[in-house]
């Protein structure tokens, strides 16, 4: 016999899954360093500026490698991946005699 789930249990389960998925995206970036305040000691300010520089370098670092342009992505979605046509040689198709 089939068990009928109550609508609120399904909604609660989906909500918990969404919150867990969003939690993984939050951990993707490092936390921003906290400002020590206006009356902080010079050592604390130097430590803060070092941490801030490291934070900025992490979130703005250059990523190397081939980038797809939006036109390439749209063409691939519309027309499919045509890499097999580019890689094939004309001698791959042998004629049947």
Curated annotation (Swiss-Prot):
Residues 1-28 form the signal peptide. The modification Tyrosine amide is found at residue 64. It is found in: Secreted. One of its GO terms (molecular function) is neuropeptide hormone activity. Keywords: Amidation, Cleavage on pair of basic residues, Hormone, Neuropeptide, Secreted, Signal. Its main location: secreted. Residues 68-97 form a propeptide. It holds the Pfam family Hormone_3. GO terms for biological process: feeding behavior; neuropeptide signaling pathway. GO terms for cellular component: extracellular space. It comes from the Eukaryota. Mainly expressed in brainstem neurons, and in the telencephalon. Also expressed in intestinal endocrine cells. The keyword Secreted applies. PANTHER family: NEUROPEPTIDE Y/PANCREATIC HORMONE/PEPTIDE YY, PEPTIDE YY-RELATED. Belongs to the NPY family. This is Peptide YY-A. It comes from Danio rerio (Zebrafish). The lineage of its organism: Eukaryota, Metazoa, Chordata, Craniata, Vertebrata. The gene is pyya.
